[in-house]
From Swiss-Prot:
Belongs to the NIP3 family. Keywords: Apoptosis, Membrane, Mitochondrion, Mitochondrion outer membrane, Phosphoprotein, Transmembrane, Transmembrane helix. It comes from Bos taurus (Bovine). The chain crosses the membrane at residues 166-186. This is BCL2/adenovirus E1B 19 kDa protein-interacting protein 3. Residues 56-69 have a biased composition (Low complexity). It is found in: Mitochondrion; Mitochondrion outer membrane.
Amino acid sequence: MSQSESPGLQEESLHGSWVELHFGSNGNGSSVPDSVSIYKGDMEKILLDAQHESGRSSSKSSHCDSPPRSQTPQDTNRASETDTHSLGEKNSSQSEEDYMERRKEVESILKKNSDWIWDWSSRPENVPPAKEFLLFKHPKRTPTLSMRNTSVMKKGGIFSAEFLKVFLPSLLLSHLLAIGLGIYIGRRLTTSTSTF
């Protein structure tokens, strides 16, 4: 094909499923497809148009047989990428009709399946389970045995009547036991040495 041929003939020749690219070499030894020099930027537009046409026809036939599926966050990202891509196409000599058509398709996809966000965010996995957090509480420290923590010490201290009623008899009894044990051991030792 040459540049003098009409663009309609160029598009008609590309409607087949295979396109042959003949590689030639430019002056510096690297190979460049001849079609790049022929179309000079029109190749991208032709390929995009062919992609959109084949996408529409294949999507119509494939949607008849397949059940509808819910939209995922990735689908939304793809839709927004298509939207930004279509903005770039509009600036690159894209017709206003195609731009508006693509824009409407993207908006309809987003409106039709916008409930997935609500469904996804209200899943039971995202609500923290209260019972599980109760199981992992840090155990309380057991209080150490101390005179300071007793109810007697908290009420009146060392000189309170309740404390003295308990402390003085126990002190006297422990001293009497210690003295009695000391006397018993002392006598045993003295009698055992005299028998030898």
